[in-house]
Design a protein with these regions (language model features):
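Cytoplasmic-side transmembrane-helix entry/capping segments in multi-pass membrane proteins
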Residues: 150-159, 177-178, 196-206, 285-293, ...
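Long hydrophobic alpha-helical segments that form multi-pass transmembrane helix bundles
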Residues: 192-271
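C-terminal ends of transmembrane helices
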Residues: 43-49, 136-149, 185-195, 272-281, ...
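Hydrophobic alpha-helical bundle architecture
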Residues: 165-168, 273-286, 299-349
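N-terminal signal-anchor module of multipass membrane proteins
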Residues: 1-126, 130
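A generic, well-ordered mixed alpha/beta core segment in the N-terminal half of proteins
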Residues: 142, 153-223
């Protein structure tokens, strides 16, 4: 089959290889080529065990597994925000309108009962975050690839989407850019790159921003994409007043109709991603089951001990599993193939 793009890349590839005039910039060519095509490198030798999977395919599987969470998160973000706008409008309460607003009014009718309006509203907030995080993340990878004279790791594609999904919808874009840069440089590159890091770069960047800019990454104004509107997360409310005081049902939390970071709200969507990871054997079922057993045991222990000052001691394990970042962290962070456990015993622990 005649493929113009493939022919063009094959034509210019020699210039980026060996003693070609552009060989220094081979990592840039490599990331563009691998973005559209599978790697043409094949291991040869009679003693090598061959498998149908490689790093590129594994990372693509993880990336695709985030899609249910991504779309559910965008829809819920729009649903929460459009309901908030409706409440403010009925109460004749003014709210700030930032640069997102012209796009929102152009592409939506501000109807919280419209599936497409909710999805598009959420996309208007999430896509800029993802684009900025992706561009800065790949930029950091390219810089280190050029310095070290090696190929760009496909792991950056997964790190950027996981980091973007962990962001609050109102997070400033420059802070998102700073966070992914810190996560990749401090969490991975200073240890030598993919396969040598013991920290999860997405979590490293998220933790840095949580402590460096707490006003933007915690509190009550970060979770619904309406400037000036306050809404506590379900975990924050439960920690302060107990889970019995929640305005949301367990089903609301499981399906994802609650405020929160873009990727953490829908446990159902996250479980769809988990099914993909387990079916393709990218994730270890031992890690998933080990964390679940540990959660149940620890939760029952706190239930037995009890506390008059900390309402979280009384929360049953099934609530722990559907609020906060528990499900997202379990499925996409704990099972991460580089920083996660590699031995079967370690996966249980």
């Amino acid at each position: 089959m005649n493929d113009p793009l493939r022919n063009f890349l094959d034509k210019i590839k020699p210039s980026f290889q060996g003693k070609g005039g552009l060989s220094y910039y081979f990592p840039i060519f490599d990331v563009i080529e691998n973005l559209f095509y599978s790697s043409d490198k094949r291991t040869k030798g009679l003693t090598h065990v061959r498998d149908g999977s490689d790093i590129q395919r594994i990372m693509v599987v993880v990336w695709l597994a985030t899609f249910p969470t991504m779309f559910a998160g965008m829809y819920n973000l729009g649903y929460q925000s459009l309901n908030a706008i409706e409440q403010l409008t009925l109460a004749n309460t003014a709210f700030e309108k930032d640069w997102h607003w012209p796009l929102i009014t152009f592409f939506t009718s501000l109807n919280p009962n419209s599936f497409m309006d909710c999805l598009v509203y959420g996309a208007i907030y999430f896509i800029p975050i993802y684009v900025v995080v992706f561009a800065v993340g790949i930029g950091c990878e390219l810089i280190f690839a050029l310095i070290r004279r090696h190929e760009v790791s496909e792991g950056a594609f997964v790190t950027t989407v996981l980091f973007a999904l962990s962001c609050p919808p109102n997070a400033p874009l420059w802070q998102c850019a700073l966070g992914i840069a810190v996560g990749l440089v401090i969490g991975k590159e200073i240890f030598g790159g993919t396969g040598k890091n013991f920290l999860n770069p997405a979590l490293t960047g998220r933790a840095f921003l949580y402590f460096a800019y707490p006003a933007s990454w915690s509190g009550d104004m970060s979770w619904v994409a309406v400037d000036g509107y306050t809404a506590a997360t379900i975990l924050g409310t439960a920690a302060q007043d107990g889970y019995q005081s929640l305005a949301y049902t367990w089903n609301n939390a499981f399906l994802g109709f609650i405020p929160g970071s873009i990727g953490e709200t829908s446990t159902l969507a996250i479980l769809v991603g988990l099914a993909i990871l387990l079916y393709t054997k990218v994730a270890s079922w031992r890690i998933v089951l080990g964390v679940a057993i540990g959660t149940i045991f620890t939760s029952y222990l706190f239930n037995i001990v009890g506390s008059e000052t900390n309402p979280m001691f009384s929360m049953p394990f099934w609530w722990h599993m559907v609020i906060g970042g528990y499900a997202f962290g379990l499925v996409f962070m704990a099972t991460e193939p580089v920083s996660g456990s590699h031995t079967n015993a370690g996966r249980w622990v």
